[in-house]
Regions:
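Zinc-dependent deaminase catalytic domain
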Residues: 1-151
Length: 151
């Protein structure tokens, strides 16, 4: 593992702390870099102008008894990976050939966006139980690496 991998993962963890998700285990951060330069960052939180679960004092998914990994559309939050990709689009920044550092393995929805965004390498720290996302990464030309496996 090189110092840049460490620095960018530390930054992803810092960005995760900005999350407005009510559930602390859902505080996720993402940093997209290319040539050792930060292109964008993202954390999971409500869309611009929408009151977050943290501000509401409750998690919509918990209130409705929605199981983790299901019905992801029933949530105020936009995922960290999605927010990082959206910021690049808003700013006109190409992600072609970039690396994404993310605190958690991307879900299948984020995986599809990452594959189409031009990002070529994803380094994640914590696992997430989404086998289909892993299958999609395996079929794509995007390299998925667990942070602890970096040497």
């Amino acid at each position: 593992m090189n110092k840049w991998d460490e620095r960018f993962m530390q930054l992803a963890e810092t960005v995760a702390g900005w999350s407005s998700c009510f559930q602390e285990n859902r505080h996720v951060g993402a940093v997209i870099v290319k040539d050792k330069r930060i292109l964008t960052t993202g954390y999971n939180g409500a869309s611009s102008g929408i009151e977050s679960c943290a501000e509401r004092g409750e998690c919509l998914r918990r209130v409705r008894n929605i199981a983790s990994g299901t019905m992801q559309e029933v949530c105020y939050a936009v995922h960290a990976e999605q927010n990082a990709i959206i910021q690049a689009a808003k700013l006109g920044v190409s992600l072609e050939g970039a690396t994404m550092y993310v605190t958690h393995q991307p879900c299948v929805i984020c995986t599809r966006m990452i594959i189409n965004s031009g990002v070529k390498r994803v380094v994640y720290k914590n696992g997430y139980p989404d086998e289909f996302a892993l299958q999609l990464f395996a079929q794509s030309d995007v390299e998925l690496i667990k942070y602890s496996d970096l040497k």
